[in-house]
A protein has these predicted regions:
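Short beta-strand->loop micro-motif that forms the acidic, two-metal-ion catalytic signature
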Residues: 53-56
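Conserved histidines in hydrophobic membrane contexts and catalytic metal-binding motifs
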Residues: 37
């Protein structure tokens, strides 16, 4: 298991680059249709303790692979990843999530 990066801040462009580089593999392996960054990294308000918040849309149901996707992304990012399925956004959080949303792929 990789050691997560708690002392070094990644930048938004670095995160977007990692996600873009890995998108084709994620689409094939996990049926990822789209990825979007939101939260503190999207707003450039991250701290060393911040996780990477990602909104994911899948091309088909993925079941437990959802959890494996988070693990797969934590390795290249060196940060804890918090995934949210696009169809799982609670109505009371929709506006705040969409306010900081940065579409990464495709």
């Amino acid at each position: 298991m990789p050691v997560l990066n708690t002392s070094n801040l990644l930048t938004r462009p670095q995160i977007i680059a990692v996600l873009t580089e890995n998108y084709a593999d994620l689409a094939q392996q996990f049926s990822v249709a789209s990825l979007a960054l939101f939260g503190s990294y999207a707003r450039d308000e991250q701290t060393p303790q911040s996780d990477v918040d990602l909104l994911v849309t899948f091309s088909k149901p993925v079941g437990f692979a959802f959890m494996h996707l988070a693990d797969r992304l934590e390795a290249p990012l060196g940060k804890r990843v918090d995934l949210l399925a696009a169809d799982g956004i609670k109505p009371n959080r929709r506006d705040s999530i969409h306010a900081s949303l940065i579409h990464v792929a495709p």
